[in-house]
């Protein structure tokens, strides 16, 4: 665990959950697994606050616990899961593009709350969608429920591990902590619920003096009497499935850039056919026959079977080897080599970074060393057609930044420089790790800058929010246009300009965070894929 990762985890925990949770989370990341009282003692936090912080972290899958032989429960932080919080906007946006606003809100609620029952998610999302609709229109629970089922069917949402029924029925003393188990066959099994109803608006005409709707209290009392139909069955967002989707999108985009749109559509079809059957960490997709691929092509994609076979042959013969042929039955069996695809994407990312940092001539040398595997300095000068002095400077720059490495091969046992070959080479895995570390530092800097910008303009932001609240309440009571105009003028022209600048800067920083995270995702996927081999 590097310092850059710990710092980024600290910033993310503080931004999402506050100082106490951040303090406990970072302590566990630094020290490893620890029991409750040791955490309280080492952090100087009260036992009650530590318990609450751990509850929050466990609810969001950021901390796991383990019962040891002597009955001691130890808590361990999941640093990689904390870093995933950086990707929350991307998960939510993906759900929106695939399953519209309903899917977006379902995934958002699950990410914000960590774990929820299906009935609670459906009711909350229906209420939120009803809020945004015109007066008189409401969102039906059944519609939200259908979208939830579709998300489960495509494995974007999955069940949380449960306490087994046998553990609850034991007559002996309860264990210090429950053992959670997950059944593979039930992980994507949706309980049969008859959710009948419509979303409710938060503000309605029958609100009483306290501002609480009358319909709310009876609902709570009935909930106490009637058991919730899916009580105890909790759901969470399946982040690995989202990562699989991001990886597939990156592969399709790479094929489209290298070849053409038809090739990318064929690869997209192959990935879609095997998305649920292929495990997230598998190096290859399941083999698919040419006939199966032809039948599964999108409606309206008018290409003949012969043309499809030609495209598949082209893809299989391509030097990048994204698609491989694994047999001849069924018109030819084809697989997508996910490991090779991730390797190519990581290499392209490294090349792009070298070009941006050091210029096109350095990128030429980098690609040359990458292609030839091992080269002496003289060979680099000759092949790249760059003067000796410039080539030496460029090689040293990249060597000092760890983009390329130097390998010594001695002719004699004494390692004398005059009798040693010095070969330049590119270790993609090592370079990817170095770049990933820099990306973590970049994101931490972006978050700190955004927080600084917001803090510097805190007074102005508070004033703007107060004015907006006054205008909203006056509009609700039917105030005249002149009165509204007078309130709006409370914010002067220079202040308005300052707010616009702040908004523009924060939007830029947010966009940068998401773009850097895309690079982080590619590098992490490649490193993970390489380590599994």
From Swiss-Prot:
Database matches in Gene3D superfamilies: 6.10.140.1450, Winged helix-like DNA-binding domain superfamily/Winged helix DNA-binding domain (1.10.10.10)
Gene Ontology CC terms: nucleoplasm; RNA polymerase III complex
A molecular-function term among this protein's GO annotations: single-stranded DNA binding
Residues that bear Phosphoserine: 194
Pfam families registered for this protein in UniProt: HTH_9 (PF08221), POLR3C_WHD (PF22536), RNA_pol_Rpc82 (PF05645), RPC3_helical (PF20912)
Disulfide-bond pairs as recorded: none
Region annotation (Disordered) ranges: 197-230
Keywords: Antiviral defense, DNA-binding, DNA-directed RNA polymerase, Immunity, Innate immunity, Nucleus, Phosphoprotein, Transcription
Compositional bias ranges of the Basic and acidic residues kind: 211-228
Biological processes annotated in GO: defense response to virus; DNA-templated transcription; innate immune response; positive regulation of innate immune response; positive regulation of interferon-beta production
Complexes and interactors: Component of the RNA polymerase III complex consisting of 17 subunits: a ten-subunit horseshoe-shaped catalytic core composed of POLR3A/RPC1, POLR3B/RPC2, POLR1C/RPAC1, POLR1D/RPAC2, POLR3K/RPC10, POLR2E/RPABC1, POLR2F/RPABC2, POLR2H/RPABC3, POLR2K/RPABC4 and POLR2L/RPABC5; a mobile stalk composed of two subunits POLR3H/RPC8 and CRCP/RPC9, protruding from the core and functioning primarily in transcription initiation; and additional subunits homologous to general transcription factors of the RNA polymerase II machinery, POLR3C/RPC3-POLR3F/RPC6-POLR3G/RPC7 heterotrimer required for transcription initiation and POLR3D/RPC4-POLR3E/RPC5 heterodimer involved in both transcription initiation and termination.
Function description: DNA-dependent RNA polymerase catalyzes the transcription of DNA into RNA using the four ribonucleoside triphosphates as substrates. Specific peripheric component of RNA polymerase III (Pol III) which synthesizes small non-coding RNAs including 5S rRNA, snRNAs, tRNAs and miRNAs from at least 500 distinct genomic loci. Part of POLR3C/RPC3-POLR3F/RPC6-POLR3G/RPC7 heterotrimer, coordinates the dynamics of Pol III stalk and clamp modules during the transition from apo to elongation state. Pol III plays a key role in sensing and limiting infection by intracellular bacteria and DNA viruses.
Family: Belongs to the eukaryotic RPC3/POLR3C RNA polymerase subunit family.
Protein's UniProt name: DNA-directed RNA polymerase III subunit RPC3
Higher taxonomy: Eukaryota, Metazoa, Chordata, Craniata, Vertebrata
């Amino acid at each position: 665990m590097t310092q850059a990762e710990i710092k980024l985890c600290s910033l993310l925990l503080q931004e999402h959950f506050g100082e106490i949770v951040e303090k406990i989370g970072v302590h566990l990341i630094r020290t490893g697994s620890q029991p409750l009282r040791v955490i309280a003692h080492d952090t100087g936090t009260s036992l009650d606050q530590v318990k609450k912080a751990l509850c929050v972290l466990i609810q969001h899958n950021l901390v796991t616990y383990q019962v040891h032989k002597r009955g001691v429960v130890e808590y361990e932080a999941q640093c990689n899961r904390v870093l995933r919080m950086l990707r929350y906007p991307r998960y939510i946006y993906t759900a929106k593009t695939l399953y519209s606003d309903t899917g977006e809100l379902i995934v958002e609620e699950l990410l914000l709350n960590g774990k929820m029952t299906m009935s609670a998610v459906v009711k909350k999302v229906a209420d939120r969608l009803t809020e945004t609709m015109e007066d008189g229109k409401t969102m039906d629970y059944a519609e939200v429920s259908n979208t939830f089922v579709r998300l489960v069917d495509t494995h974007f949402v999955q069940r949380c591990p449960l306490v087994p029924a046998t553990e609850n029925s034991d007559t002996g003393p309860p264990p210090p902590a429950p053992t959670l188990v997950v059944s593979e066959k039930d992980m994507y099994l949706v309980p049969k619920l008859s959710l009948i109803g419509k979303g409710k608006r938060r503000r309605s005409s029958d609100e009483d003096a306290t501002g609480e709707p009358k319909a709310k209290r009876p609902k709570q009392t009935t909930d106490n009497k009637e058991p919730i139909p899916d009580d105890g069955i909790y759901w969470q967002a399946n982040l690995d499935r989202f990562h699989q989707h991001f990886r597939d999108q990156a592969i399709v985009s790479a094929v489209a850039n290298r070849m053409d749109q038809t090739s990318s559509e064929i690869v997209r079809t192959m990935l879609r056919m095997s998305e649920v059957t292929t495990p997230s960490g598998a190096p290859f997709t399941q083999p698919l026959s040419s006939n199966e691929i032809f039948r599964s092509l999108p409606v309206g994609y008018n290409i003949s079977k012969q043309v499809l076979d030609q495209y598949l042959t082209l893809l299989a013969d391509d030097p990048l080897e994204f698609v491989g042929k694994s047999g001849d039955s069924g018109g030819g069996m084809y697989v997508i080599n996910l490991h090779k695809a991730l390797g190519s994407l990581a290499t392209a990312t490294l090349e792009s970074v070298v070009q941006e940092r050091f210029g096109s001539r350095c990128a030429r040398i980098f690609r040359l060393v990458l292609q030839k595997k091992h080269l002496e300095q003289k060979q680099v000068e000759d092949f790249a057609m760059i003067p000796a002095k410039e080539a030496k400077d460029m090689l040293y720059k990249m060597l000092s930044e760890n983009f390329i490495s130097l390998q010594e091969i001695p002719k004699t046992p004494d390692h004398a420089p005059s009798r040693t070959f010095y070969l330049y080479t590119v270790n993609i895995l090592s370079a990817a790790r170095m770049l990933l570390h820099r990306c973590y530092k970049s994101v931490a800097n972006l978050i700190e800058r955004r927080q600084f910008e917001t803090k510097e303009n805190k007074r102005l932001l508070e004033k703007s929010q107060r004015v907006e609240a006054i205008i909203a309440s006056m509009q609700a009571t039917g105030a005249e246009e002149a009165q509204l105009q007078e309130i709006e003028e409370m914010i002067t022209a220079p202040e308005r300009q300052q707010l616009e600048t702040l908004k523009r800067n924060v939007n830029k920083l947010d966009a940068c965070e998401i773009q850097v995270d895309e690079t982080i995702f590619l590098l992490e996927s490649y490193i993970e894929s390489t380590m599994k081999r």
